[in-house]
Amino acid sequence: TQPHAFRLRGEGGAVEPAALAQGTVIEVANLYFNTPARRKFLKSESTEYAHCDEVLRRMALARPDVAFSIGHNSSQKRRLASADFSRRAREIIGDDFFPQARALDESAGTLRLSGLAALPAYSRAGRDEQYFFVNGRFVRDKLLSHAARQAWADILHGARHPAYVLFLELDPAGVDVNVHPAKTEVRFRDAQGIHR
């Protein structure tokens, strides 16, 4: 721990001491001010904010013990106090999900799968409420998505999708997280064993 905070300005500034309560503040403004080619590919302000909020939601689900807040245009949009996992899941996904969700905690060898999975009555038209974490890291993985889809195959029909917040824990040597620059894709050493 340090007796004070530090500030680093991305405008070419040096690291300097700053006053701050305990925690971390990340502020982004004019990110592509000097790269107009990148700036022209940005979506609308509301779409870009929604992407930032989704990143916060994923981090908050992965770490319910940490408080999070997000602001936009000088106003606070979301504030989450540290909480247990159940409370955090309710805050992030909503009150409708929680009564339909069932806790699960299963182990097989060195694998452990835990989290919340919604009953078929809470199926979704999209994949907006599917959160899969591997060793605490949010991932989008075709293998895991397929395994989850198969688990609901006999009870979900048509274009409906299950809702879940699932955590897969395994030996870090059994998964390569350096597959995608954003670290949202992984490669498993024993993909068939994971899928079962």
Range-by-range predicted roles:
Residues T1-R196:
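N-terminal phosphate-binding caps/lids of nucleotide- and nucleic-acid-binding domains
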